[in-house]
Amino acid sequence: MIRPTRRALLATPLAAPALAQSGFPNRPIRLIIPWLPGGVADHLRLLADLAGQNLGQTVVPENRPGVSGTLGPALIAQEPRGDGHLIGQIPITAFRIPAMLRRPPFDPMADFTWVIHLSGYCFGVVVRQDSPFTTWEELLAHAKANPGRISYASPGSGSSAHIAMERIAEENGAPFLHVPYRGGSDTAQALLSGAVDCTADSTSWVPLVRDGTFRLLVTWGAGRARSFPEVPTLRETGIDLVSDSPFGLAAPKNTDPGVVRALHDALRPALFDPRHVEMLDRFDMPMRYMGPEEYTAFARRLNEEEGAAVRRLGLRMD
């Protein structure tokens, strides 16, 4: 079970938020989810429902997948001034993809107002149950011996799964064939159909591992996944890499601070609601609460780190 930190518990309000200004919210709030429906992305649908109850107004989840999770943030960045009725998930790719483009669609530090940091993902590599590979070491050895012959699905070019696999390939002399898709449900279907040899993704694959359809070979966290304690981490197999792709919610630039506070104060108890905590736990997603000020500072550091990584690896998308 995910156990929130003492600081986070003390920060959790005991009552519904005081609204920032008269009349807010005065219509449904759109929550942009930059992934396909299904799997791990659906925790945001539950969060929207719980936050809407706190606000006394419907929060409508809206899936806008594409461009490795950056189509949704691009829609938010287009708004010249936020009024609180449009928010969305900002995945780590929103810091990475702009650094890979000559003409990025948005500036992650100029075009968003940071509302609340939520969590991260548990990544891993899965194969079908009938795959000849029973361990990660076997798969990696085959990729080394057969460069470019082992294909893997990811949720998109520039995604955390893609970047990590390319780093593994480069550092271990094991070139893989990358096949990008739009999200977790697509990557799972690709593996089910035999279109790829394996999938590198966050825990959208959990139900299919639990029912025996897929086999989990390795996870990418600092420690073993709670749900799969028998599965080793990359570090345990000799690869010094940890990836968990932290994320939160943001509003458009220039959103009134009072509106940001009202949104935050509705989302914070929703984040810690036992029903939402149970869903995070189901997908091995860590609780990583940060308020607006702390999240803004974290986003600035993340933007610097991701830009440096892109330059170091020479990654381009145009």
Predicted regions: what is each one?
Residues 1-14:
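N-terminal secretory signal peptides and thylakoid transit peptides that target proteins
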Residues 17-31, 80-85, 140-150, 210-211, ...:
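Immediate post-signal peptide segment of exported/extracytoplasmic ligand-binding proteins
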Residues 20-109, 157, 174-200, 208, ...:
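N-terminal (or domain-start) structured segment
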Residues 78-85, 99-182, 186, 234, ...:
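Hinge/capping helix and adjacent helix->loop/strand transition within the periplasmic-binding protein
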Residues 92-94, 120, 130, 204, ...:
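Solvent-exposed coil/turn segments that connect beta secondary-structure elements
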Residues 205-272, 301-304:
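C-terminal lobe and pocket-closing loops
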